[in-house]
Amino acid sequence: MARKRQQQQKRPISSSITKRRVMLFGIIAIIAAGIGAYGYKSMIPVNGKAPAFGFPANHFIKATSSANSGYFYVSQSSGSVRGLRGSGGGGGIVNPTYTFQKGNLQSIHVINEDYNTHSHHNFNIDAFNVHTKDLGYFETQTMTFVPNKTGTFEYYCSIHPEMKGNIIVEGE
């Protein structure tokens, strides 16, 4: 009996347990690498090649329409927000003009709230390679970019040309 116990104690760890541990470690490593790659890619602005570390300025804009005014963008920020100019009625500024500083990270959050017509809308700034997909009713998309040149640039909806405004980028 004592001999059997000694033999059992000297046996190497089962190879199936070792294989399972190695496979589990490999799966965890692959998942961690995938999450890391996704996180790295999500930090790259649409007009950049390297990740931008820091917090962007956030701008909220909704696409909508009315029977009287047609299609338009409305800011979701109050008029006192730095970087926002324009005039308009309702709950925000209609087709607002945004003012950014060159080199500062910006995020534009677009939502289609066109309840009246349920039309698709998009948001484009060609100068900075900012293009959303065609958004259906109540769909959203966020685009993060760095304004890397000064001047006045137009943003617009390619589906409804009357939906447009300006972005002014000032020097550093």
Question: Where in the sequence are the language-model features?
Answer:
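Extracytoplasmic copper-binding redox domains, predominantly the cupredoxin/blue-copper superfamily
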Residues: 2-172
